[in-house]
Swiss-Prot record:
The gene is tarA. GO terms for biological process: cell wall organization; teichoic acid biosynthetic process. Its EC number is 2.4.1.187. The keyword RNA-binding does not apply. The keyword Transferase applies. It is an enzyme of class 2 (transferase). Belongs to the glycosyltransferase 26 family. TagA/TarA subfamily. Pathway: Cell wall biogenesis; poly(ribitol phosphate) teichoic acid biosynthesis. One of its GO terms (molecular function) is N-acetylglucosaminyldiphosphoundecaprenol N-acetyl-beta-D-mannosaminyltransferase activity. This is N-acetylglucosaminyldiphosphoundecaprenol N-acetyl-beta-D-mannosaminyltransferase. Catalyzes the conversion of GlcNAc-PP-undecaprenol into ManNAc-GlcNAc-PP-undecaprenol, the first committed lipid intermediate in the de novo synthesis of teichoic acid. Keywords: Cell wall biogenesis/degradation, Glycosyltransferase, Teichoic acid biosynthesis, Transferase.
Amino acid sequence: MQTKPINQLDFVDSELTSFVSHLETTYLDQNKGAFIVTANPEIGFEAMQNPRYEAVLSSADFILPDGIGVVMVSKLIGKPLQSRIAGYDLFTSLLDKADQKKKRVFFYGAAKHVIAETIERVKRDFPGIEIAGYSDGYVKDQREVADKIAASTPDMVFVALGYPNQEFFIHKYRHLFPQAVAVGLGGSFDVFSGNVKRAPSFFIRFHLEWMYRLLTNPARWRRMLSIPKYVTAVLKHERASAKPHYTGQVKDQSRHL
């Protein structure tokens, strides 16, 4: 799977259908695990500020450009990515695959009523999925949840704890369920369960989901600042990387008489 670097992270350069097909043939059909990060500008900016988090993201098998801000900055630095791959779209696409292939899936994250409603919808709309287990995101002992996941032998693990917690969790415990495709999904359970409304198709088609979220929840304006902050930080990093570095060696071209 082709990737392109933005700052220190290698982003998948593909589109949703091709990526899911690659996951299906190379991982799901082979019972091979993978760690997938769905990185929006907030995650990208946090990684630039936090070396430990950056290292965790870099350990993932795939980093997806989940956010038009990531795609936009890729074009500005001359490394254009083909498409945004939204975490929610990946989630529903993988549910389709799990339904078709009778896969075992574990769901972890969100509030108790949200995870309960998520499981209820999965049972209704994806009857072929075998629910390996689930847990809300407020269990204090994460190792307890990790052991529960391991014991359930899932084919897929969806973790919706929000960044950076979901990535730290998968990175720390994926060795307990090495056969599973594990994905960090942010607030996807909230949308899937109907507790949060996703942007109408018009906003999605024109890459304006951020505007819809801001219009419907003005309190998010501080989070929206991550987009220009990320773009500015990446451009600054690219300019610094492009500058020639003085090696300390100067060739003596003087004429000796």
